[in-house]
Amino acid sequence: MRRSFFFFAVLFLGLSVVCSCSKEEVPNSYPQPDVNTGDLPMGDAYITDSAYLTANHLKVYNFVYPSVDPYGEPVMLSGSITMGDDVSRGVPANGLLLYNHFTVYRADECPSRGELSTQGMATGMGLITISADYYGFGVTEHHHQAYCISLYNAQTCIDALMAAKQLLGQMGYSWDDVLFNVGYSQGGQTSMAVVALAAERYPDLNITYTIAGAGSYDLPETYRQFVDATIAGMPSTVISVMLSYNEFKNVGLSRGEMFLEPVLSHIDEWILSKKYTRPEIDAMVGSLVIGDYITPALLDTTSASSRALTAALESDNLCKGWTPRGSERIMLFHSVRDITVPVSNTQRMYDFLTSHGVQDVDLQIHDIEGTSTTPAHENASLMFGLLTLQKIRAILGISA
C-alpha cells in the first residue's frame, strides 16, 4: 500500500516522473508529438512511437485518434496507453482504467509529453490505463485548451478509450471486462461528464466504478459563490474557465470586458503560451481576490456580460439535463475547506444522482486544510488518492 500511495501522492501534486528508456524498445528521450505544423490529417487511430519505459516501470504507447474539436469538427487528438510490468500480451489484464487528468497549463504536462506520474497508480494492480491529452495539448498544442468544458472533454476521453481498446487488441493485449473511470479536479468534472455521456449516448459502455474528486460539476453555482466569497484558491483556473467558455461557447466578450491589469495584458504570455505551470501563473496573478483581476461588470451578476457568461456555464451544468443510469457505482470526494472548487459542487452532484435513483453513491466529505504554500484543493488530493486505491483494490480483490 505504501508504494501505491506514494504514486498517488506524487500524482496529484503534479510532480513529473523522470524518464528512463529501455534499450530494446525506446528512443533516448520522450517521443515528442508534432505540434507546429497545424492539425494532423484525419484518419484511423495509430500508435505514434515505439513503446518506452519510464523510471517507475511503466510501459507507454503514445497514440493519435480521431475525435472532434470543441466546435464539433473532426480533429485528430493524442493520448497515452500505460501499463505496469505486471501486464503482458497473452495474459488478460485485470481491466482498464480511464484516467482523466487534472488542470495543467504547461505544454509538457500532458500524458503524451511525458507527464505520467498519475499513471503509476496502476502499477501492481494489473490495469491498463488510458489517458487523453485533451484538446489544446499534445498534437493540438497549438490550439487553446477547452478548459473545464466537461461534456466536450468527456467526448474526447471516450473517443480515446474506444481507439485505445482497438489498438490494444491489434497489439495482442486483452483484459477482463472491468472499467474504472477516475479523475480529480478538472479530471473529476470530466469523469462525471463521462458518466453523463455514457448514459445518454453509449448504452454499451459499462463503467464498473467511477471515482470523481473535487470537480466543478455546477459551474454557474461555482461562479456565484466566487462572487459572494470574493476569493478563489487558484486564480488561473477562474481566468481559464472564462477564456474557454468565452471562446468555445461564443459568449462574445472582449478580454477588456473580462479582465483587469496586469492580467489583461499578459493573457497570451502567462496562460495561452503554455510556458508556465499552475503555481507559476497564480504567483504572477498575485492575488486570490477575484476583484483584483476580474472586471466589476462580471462580478455584478445582474450585468449583461455576467448573464451571458452564466448562460454559457449553465449549458455545461452536470447537475441537470441528463438521466443517470440507476446501476452506476460512484464515489464522490471533496474537502469542505476547498476554496478552489467549492464543496457544494459535490453535494449538488450527490443530490442529483440520488434523486434520479442512483443508490450506490459513496459520498466522501472531509475536512482537509491547506497550507501557506499548498491550497486545500491540492492537499485533499492525497486523501482522494488513498481512498481511490482502496476502492480499486477492493473491487479487484487485491490485498493491501
What is the role of each PLM region?
Residues 326, 331-338:
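Short beta-strand/loop motif that positions the catalytic acidic residue
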Residues 162-234:
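Primarily recognizes the serine-hydrolase "nucleophile elbow" in alpha/beta-hydrolase
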Residues 305, 311-312, 340, 347-348, ...:
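C-terminal catalytic histidine-bearing segment of alpha/beta-hydrolase fold enzymes
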Residues 213-323:
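Accessory cap/linker subdomain of secreted extracellular hydrolases
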Residues 147-170:
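Alpha/beta-hydrolase active-site loop
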Residues 21-88, 92:
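Catalytic-loop region of hydrolases
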Residues 70-78, 82-125:
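Short, surface-exposed "cap/lid" segments of acyl-processing enzymes
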Residues 194, 328-329, 342-353:
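Short alpha-helix in the alpha/beta-hydrolase fold that links the catalytic acid
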